[in-house]
Curated annotation (Swiss-Prot):
Any Pfam family the entry gives: RF3_C
Organism, as annotated: Marinomonas sp. (strain MWYL1)
Binding residue positions for GTP: 20-27, 88-92, 142-145
GO CC, any one term: cytosol
Source taxon at top rank: Bacteria
PROSITE patterns on file: G_TR_1, G_TR_2
Protein name: Peptide chain release factor 3
Annotated family: Belongs to the TRAFAC class translation factor GTPase superfamily. Classic translation factor GTPase family. PrfC subfamily.
Domain tr-type G: from-to ranges: 11-279
GO biological process: regulation of translational termination
Subcellular location as annotated: Cytoplasm
Gene of this entry: prfC
Keywords: Cytoplasm, GTP-binding, Nucleotide-binding, Protein biosynthesis
MF terms (GO), sorted A to Z: GTP binding; GTPase activity; guanosine tetraphosphate binding; translation release factor activity, codon nonspecific; translation release factor activity, codon specific
Length: 528
């Protein structure tokens, strides 16, 4: 029987990620959540108050320059007797693979929608990922103090485009310059909006009862029409159903303005009450329950140079069961080796501290000296492999050349380490000594060039290369596979993880190779 203190620790955990289209307000909301969790005293917007303050969660130099989240950082804070683990995901579409893997490490998701723009394409793609896993989703419609679209229209769009039932919990009173607050349909409470920059925690000004004299005074001549609007909303929208939310079929919806720190508290209150505690996880041999006492976890991300002073790499681990305690022994299942871990760390946006213990649902960082890969499983001895952590074939390819040929070793090391993070992939063709970098989008090339220069002191040049697509190859017939490798040597490369890859110059070439070698399997994704 598991220890009651341990069971309480697990059931108090809430581990989630935020998804949104770029510029919908994700970084601002992240900051306000940290403010509510009292991790920071004042919030600075991404662009900086008086130009001096960057968002706490955007801690890499290039992110500070561009104002988009490129890497996922992890923040833990206490709130209302719960321990909240927030994973910030990259806010740019070129980093979708990193985001996808981050979503495998959480139990629920907060979706931010820009009230002026509605559902945008990046949100649609991220929702598709959440739907694969039936992830529970809570929605915050942002920017109510601006000119926004009709709220009923926004709810309809969420339902039609994202194929999920929407249940409003709060409802806006006015919008833009006439925004007065939100009304909670379940507690019959008005939360009054006070204009100002939400850099600090505001008092929660409430009016109890839509029929109260205070409510009539706040709404003035609009009171009757607002009462009618609420009746219409109640009649036309879904009621909140907790089980449907946990199944990923219904999303509770909150309205507010993150910049002014309004509506975020109500949303967080709902989140800690309704979001699931750590869920059970599938492995290649059995389901691992979050409340099992034996420790297990998997690596969903690797980040190089989180601290340029230490030139290190950190592997981010989701704890799936049991307790991590400092100095414990754990089995690195892929290589079958037992290691003693004394220096695991936790993060708040670049500030790292040692972890004494961590429980199911927590995210910890392990120092990685090149032996840990994305998808690796760690246990207290049992041989397991957590499943469902994918690697996608890249869509763009560039040859990398050095400005200074003497720095080849540093270039190779830099590209190898950056590819281990999983947002770009390195390919080394068998026919020559070229280095080819594959990516999902153009921004990743800029990031790699910037980080090579900033962290490895290497300047590189990209050149066009005759590669259209990459496929991982495998074959059960050893003799046939040898024949394939000899005949197709000019198209074969080894990727950064040591896997054999077929680089096709055209789509037609790939189709012909697949026809000619039916025994060989060509994969566009592979499990880590």
């Amino acid at each position: 029987m598991a220890d009651q203190n341990f069971l309480n620790e697990v059931s108090d955990r809430r581990t989630f990620a935020i998804i949104s289209h770029p510029d919908a307000g994700k970084t601002t909301i992240t900051e306000k959540l940290l403010l509510l969790g009292q991790l920071i005293q004042t919030a600075g917007s991404v662009k900086g108050r008086k130009g001096d303050k960057h968002a706490t969660s955007d801690w890499m130099a290039m992110e500070k320059q561009r104002g988009i989240s490129i890497t996922s950082s992890v923040m833990q804070f206490p709130y209302k007797d719960r321990i909240v683990n927030l994973l910030d995901t990259p806010g740019h579409e070129d980093f979708s693979e990193d985001t996808y893997r981050t979503l495998t490490a959480v139990d629920s998701v907060l979706m931010i929608i820009d009230g002026a723009k509605g559902v945008e394409d990046r949100t649609i793609k991220l929702m598709d990922v959440c739907r694969l896993r039936d992830t529970p989703i809570l929605t915050f419609i942002n920017k109510m103090d601006r000119d926004i679209r009709d709220p009923i229209e926004l709810l309809d769009e969420v339902e039609e485009v994202l194929k999920i039932a929407a249940a409003p919990i709060t409802w806006p009173i006015g919008m833009s310059d006439f925004f007065k607050g939100v009304y909670n349909l379940y507690t019959d409470t008005i939360h009054v909006f006070v204009r100002g920059r939400g850099h600090t925690l505001m008092d929660d000004i409430r009016i109890e009862g839509l029929q109260s004299n205070e409510a009539k005074e706040l709404l003035g001549d609009d009171w009757e029409s607002y009462v009618d609007e609420i009746e219409l909303v109640r009649g036309a929208s879904h009621e909140f159903d907790h089980d449907a939310y946990l199944r990923g079929e219904l999303t509770p919806v909150f309205f507010g303005t993150a910049l002014s720190n309004f509506g975020v508290r109500e949303m967080l209150d709902g989140f800690v009450e309704w979001a699931p505690a750590p869920i059970d996880r599938e492995t290649n041999s059995r389901k691992v329950e979050a409340k099992e006492e034996k420790f297990s976890g998997f690596i969903f991300k690797i980040q190089a140079n989180m601290d340029p002073k230490h030139r290190d790499r950190i592997a981010f681990m989701r704890v799936c069961s049991g307790t991590y305690s400092r100095g414990m022994k754990m089995r690195h299942c892929r290589i079958g080796k037992d290691i003693k871990v004394t220096d695991a760390v936790s993060f708040t946006a670049g500030d790292r501290e040692g972890v004494e213990e961590a429980f199911s649902g927590d995210i910890i960082g392990l120092h990685n000296h090149g032996t840990i890969q994305i998808g690796d499983t760690f246990t207290e001895g049992e041989d397991l492999k957590f499943t469902g952590i994918p690697h996608f074939a890249p869509e763009l390819f560039r040859r990398v050349r050095l400005k200074d040929p003497m720095k080849m070793k540093a270039l190779q090391k830099g590209l190898q380490q950056l590819s281990e993070e999983g947002s770009t992939q390195l390919f080394m063709p068998q026919r020559n000594n070229e280095l080819i970098v594959g990516a999902v989008g153009q921004l990743q090339y800029e990031v790699v060039a910037y980080r090579l220069k900033d962290e490895y002191k290497v300047e590189c040049i990209y050149e066009a290369v005759n590669v259209n697509s990459a496929r991982w190859v495998e074959c059960d017939d050893a003799k046939k596979f040898e024949e394939f490798k000899n005949k197709c040597r000019d198209n074969l490369a080894i990727d950064g993880g040591g896997h054999l890859t077929y680089l096709a110059p055209t789509r037609v070439n790939l189709m012909m190779a697949e026809e000619k070698w039916p025994q060989v399997r060509f994969h566009s994704t592979r499990e880590h």
